[in-house]
Amino acid sequence: MGNTCVGPNLNPNGFLQSVSAAVWRNQKPDDSIKSSKDESSRKKNDKSVNGDDSNGHVSSTVDPAPSTLPTPSTPPPPVKMANEEPPPKPITENKEDPNSKPQKKEAHMKRMASAGLQIDSVLGRKTENLKDIYSVGRKLGQGQFGTTFLCVDKKTGKEFACKTIAKRKLTTPEDVEDVRREIQIMHHLSGHPNVIQIVGAYEDAVAVHVVMEICAGGELFDRIIQRGHYTEKKAAELARIIVGVIEACHSLGVMHRDLKPENFLFVSGDEEAALKTIDFGLSVFFKPGETFTDVVGSPYYVAPEVLRKHYSHECDVWSAGVIIYILLSGVPPFWDETEQGIFEQVLKGDLDFISEPWPSVSESAKDLVRRMLIRDPKKRMTTHEVLCHPWARVDGVALDKPLDSAVLSRLQQFSAMNKLKKIAIKVIAESLSEEEIAGLKEMFKMIDTDNSGHITLEELKKGLDRVGADLKDSEILGLMQAADIDNSGTIDYGEFIAAMVHLNKIEKEDHLFTAFSYFDQDGSGYITRDELQQACKQFGLADVHLDDILREVDKDNDGRIDYSEFVDMMQDTGFGKMGLKVS
């Protein structure tokens, strides 16, 4: 399955998240992420095969903290997640050398609710009628712009996936161009064994239909979890496939810009099934020397130069490096309790090769990852150099022994929690407003055991202890000081609400009560296992490790999830200060 060295050389949890939401880290001027009121980014199209929208996309609205923390009258500005938010407006600032080549300016416009454009043709050509060739079957998934159906070729009986994009949802000329470009790129990359194959594109009066091969073998992480074990050698094989796809894209002038494990699916459940790269909704064509400014991607995987709004194809190598780091350790290299914190870590954080399981990982593997995650894109390894690295080569030095079992456990939690949040994100519509504050008030009361209206350090310690957080006193004190804006020595109700609302803003202003009510179908005030299973079934998500989710989220062990526990889960990025604990 792997690629050889060939090709062109193109140069824990619970209340921890509730409190640490108030951590607004200082930034040095040259490393800060400049905010823009109207800028944000999102994935334009739903997953092309399984119909899942990607969650947790990067937006460019990241506000650095001041050097001191005055008492604000309103919550800090939000960091919005891109897959449900409007695309970025054009970048007008240009601080480059005027003699340098112009930067790519994608004319994204803020999406407004409308009946859509009067579109004569998206594809620019007359096509056959989809239903004359295919029988359209059950829905596989629903996305922001399109719905994915199973379709069957009437002549051969072969199954495919068909993504149908309603024209009325294409509200700007840029939306139309995005659809055209994605189809063009899929055709451009057609023939590569590890790129999803487009079969055809069709258009009628109301929609565009993109027919492609169906990938029914599940996501990359899920396959690893199902097998129960894998070796460093297998990780190297997967790395070759991932980087080989990137090299092929770059050699054809395509930058993916949204590489992450969820965008790699297996064609079938067979042991030797091909791994395919999917979803080119954020991909663009690029020319040598061309730079881009729009902030796109997903938080854990986004490259630092993307956050700084000056990047090119090297950003894909960084994302691949993050994926390989996760394949070897089970956790992402840069994480925090908030998305802004994740961005800070991407820009400045240190790589951890000390914690388990890294002592048992080969030095060659660590060398490769380290060189793929160099922040200076010009010093970062190229795809060709990665494929030629001793660890990544087909006959390379990757160890043929099982990786630490903790890796599998961490991958399982990481994958499962993301999927549940995906469902919740899909069903959120309008603002929680009053309902959201009511939920936070109950959370505050739960920690403020003496009902004084202030959370003391001792109450915070006990609250964290109740949910099993394993933190040093110095770390808890650090959280306390970060949330205590007026330096009173306690966290008052206003500070707590400000911190929590800020975190909800980071979650795309998620209206959590709406999502909770979706799961709580009988209105009991609790989400049961059966309700979770039914919701997952409705969204086509099988084997989502429901028992693991309940164990992680159900803090009082009553076998169900109440609203407070649900809020904790939604605000948890998955990794506490000490990493995921494995029993």
From Swiss-Prot:
Biased composition (Pro residues): 67-79
List of residues binding Ca(2+) 1: D448, D450, S452, H454, E459
Class of the enzyme per the UniProt entry, highest EC level: transferase
Positions where lipid (N-myristoyl glycine) attaches: G2
Catalytic activity: L-seryl-[protein] + ATP = O-phospho-L-seryl-[protein] + ADP + H(+); L-threonyl-[protein] + ATP = O-phospho-L-threonyl-[protein] + ADP + H(+)
Enzyme Commission identifier(s): 2.7.11.1
Segments for region (Autoinhibitory domain): 398-428
Modified residues (Phosphoserine): S298
Pfam families: EF-hand_7, Pkinase
Record's comment describing the protein's domains: There are 3 contiguous domains conserved in the CDPK subfamily: a kinase domain, an autoinhibitory (junction) domain and a calmodulin-like domain. The autoinhibitory domain (398-428) inactivates kinase activity under calcium-free conditions.
Protein name: Calcium-dependent protein kinase 20
